Structures are given as C-alpha cells and as structure tokens.
Amino acid sequence: MAPKTATRIAVTHCLLALPAALGCGGGPDLQHLAQEAVLGTGAQAEMARAALRAAGPAGLEALCEAHRGLLERAETHRDPERLADDAEWRSLGAALDAVGRARDNHAARLYWHTDLEAAKAAARAGGKPILSLRLLGNLDDEFSCANSRFFRTVLYANADVSRLLRDEFVLHWQSVRPVPRVTIDFGDGRVLERTITGNSIHYVLDAEGRPLDGLPGLYSPAEFVAQLRALRALATQSAGPPGALRIVRLGEVDPVRAYHAEALNRLRRRWAGQLMTSGAPVELALSGLARGFPRAEIAAERAFSKMRAELPILGATRLDDWPLEHATEQIGWERLAARLLPDVQLDAGSLRLMRTKVAAASGCRTDAMAGGGLDAIVESFRRSIALDTVRNELLFHREIHKWFLHGVGGDDLDLLNARVYAELFLTPDDDPWLGLLPADVYAALPGGGVRTGPRP
C-alpha cells in the first residue's frame, strides 16, 4: 500500500472515531483527547493535539493534568539522555509543544496565541493585558533566534515567571521574519549549526492590542517579573470600556505617558546609583542624577494654552544622558553588570532545561555535566544574562520610554515594532540580509557566496 493511501485511510479512521472523543453535550472530551495526543499513533495523535489546541488554555491544562505523573517524574529525573530516549516522554513533549505552540513547553506549560485578534478576544473576555512576543523565526521551532531560545530557558521555564504569565496575561507571539542560520561543516563528520543575528522583544498590550510598553531582549527573571507586575498595574489603570479609544481629557495626564515619565526617573536614578557603587567618577554620576527629569513635559500638558508654547521648548532644552553614558563607558558595561549578578538566579526549572540542552556529543563538551562542567556553563550564562539585562534596560528600554513619553509609541504595534527593529536592533525591514551582506566587501566567491531559494 502506498504511504499516501495509508495516511488517508488513517485520517479517515480518526474522523470516524472522533465522535467518541466528544462529550455528551457535543463539546470535546478533553481528558480523552489528552490521552490520544500522547498515546495515540500517527494521524490520531495529530488530530487530538489539534483539538486540544483549538480548546485553548483549557486544552493545555487537560493535557498537563492527564500526564501529571510523567511530568512530575521528569522533574526529578537525573539522567537527561535516558529521559530523552523514553518514547512516551518524547510524545508528551511534542504534544505540549503543539498545543501550546512553543518549543520546550514541558518546562513552561504555557498557551500562546499566534493570532492577535484571538488574543485580543481572550484578553477582553478575561480582563487581562496581552504579552506579545515578536521574534525572528517561530517560538515552536528549536532554531528560533537566540534570544527567544534564552527566553524559553531563563524566563518561561522559571516557576515565578510562568505562573505570572499564565495567571495575569494572555500570551501571543508573531514572527518578524525567518531567522538566519549558519552551518559549519568541519569535514570530518562534525557539524556546528547555530542561528546568527536577530533580536526579540516582549510588548505589553492592553486588551484592545494597543502598546503600553516593550521589554527589549533578555532580562533576568527577577527584573522581568518586576517590569511585568508594574505593567499589569498600568493596564488596569489605563483600561477603558471594550473598544473604547484611549482618550485623555483636557487637564488630565495620560497614565501611559506618566508611567513612562516616572520609569525614566527611576531608571536614571538607578543607573547613577549603580555607577557610584561600581567605582565610576562620582561627579559624572551625580551630574547625570541631577539632570532634569521629564515630569515637566507632562506637567505642561495640564494647561493647554501653556502646552503649545512650552512643550517645544522643554523638548529642545531637555538635557540628555551623556554623563551617565560617559561614566558607563569609562568603567565598562561588564563592571556595571557585575553589580546585578547576585540577582540573576536560575531556578530549578531553568537548570533542568539547561541540563537537557548541554551538548554531550563525542568531541564536543563530552561529560560536560561531570566535574563541575555544567556549573561553569551556568555561571558564564548568568554573567551574560546580567550584561544583557543592564544593556537592554539602560540603552534600549530607555529609548522606548522616551518614545512613549513623547507620544510616538503610538497605538500601532506594527509601526512601533518596525521602529524598534530599525533603530534599536539595527535590522530594518528594508534590509533582507540583516546587515550580513555589506555592499563593499569582496568575498572571492561566485556571486559573493549568495544563493537564493527555499531553505532545504
């Protein structure tokens, strides 16, 4: 029998058997589907996973509950390689990824929408804001961009982060473009495959899909939670009736702009304090701390007649953060990040996921988990997270605060995202090569080594 014919017969059989998976009221029997999604074969399991996906977060919850015993055993399993060889565990992992639309979802157990309109409907129904991730590649692919892979390890697998995301936000992701991949063939059977370039950003949106803020790149779990809790409160404060425009009455202060004004205040005070405790020149740090904060621009809006005259002046005369930037350059970002290192902690869930990812192939970090090898990898990763947290907050997030403060954050998420990728991440939409193909570089290869066509 031809493979295609066999597949059609299997699918037909599953369709005929589908009524058995329905409850008395005609709705899906999630418990039955949860079993079929893992223990079923071929098209049967695929259809069960699709039905659980269509059921929304309840489908994912049913899948986790039905296989709670296996999930709990995996949490205490000390041999990642033996666990990976378990057929039922592999099937459960694939089911969790398919239903939640995220790779490594056994560690996070989160449900992600891939349709923003569906996410907005869920947010309105649940009275929650939306956390919308923009990334290169797809979140449910192993080879999504590096930052999104780090999110899956550092953030989504973290118990505190995943609980906050599950309880307080509706989750959504959208790919900006495919992620570049590079393969290095050493010619002796060894191949190294990685992604290169690309960045990711989490946006917090109100239930109507309007941006409230963006958290660019990787943050430590503690900092990520703190930022999201503050934005959850802002979403509640700024919420209006479903479908209502976000309008600020004359004499009132826009809560979103006020939030970003105060966030800039806190950021600059914190920056100056970190510099002073890191050995930066005190006069430069204090000079940065003494600079005028943006609250005056908010205050000017309280009187409309004054606003038209004063806002252009305030915008032109507002001093920048040069002293803070200069002091940071003098001591180095690594020294500043070292102050944050004690707060960068990976919990048990993140460490378990890291353990499964550490390469143990012959000739490549063999026995990396023995003799303290994994500890060294974890410590190096923690330092990298601390550096990313400091740079992303003080460089990128600072600019995003300014955009919102000056009213250019806008209600259009796509326009905001295009600006983030063009001006902050330096990967604009109009550069199909993401800066990897300079026009003035000679490669001594036919066509510059460029090939076009679908990815194999």
Region annotations inferred by a language model:
Residues M1-T7:
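N-terminal secretory signal peptides that target proteins for export/translocation
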Residues A10-A21:
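Bacterial N-terminal signal peptides
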Residues G27-Y111, R124-A125, V225-P456:
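Non-globular targeting/processing and membrane-anchoring segments
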Residues A37, D115-P129, L135:
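A short beta-strand-turn-helix
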Residues A62-A66, A108, R134-L135, D141-S148, ...:
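Short, solvent-exposed loop/turn and secondary-structure capping segments
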Residues H113-R124, F150-D213, A226-L231, V378-R391, ...:
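Thioredoxin-like thiol-disulfide oxidoreductase module
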Residues G126-F143, L171:
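Short active-site neighborhood of thiol/selenol oxidoreductases, capturing the structured segment around
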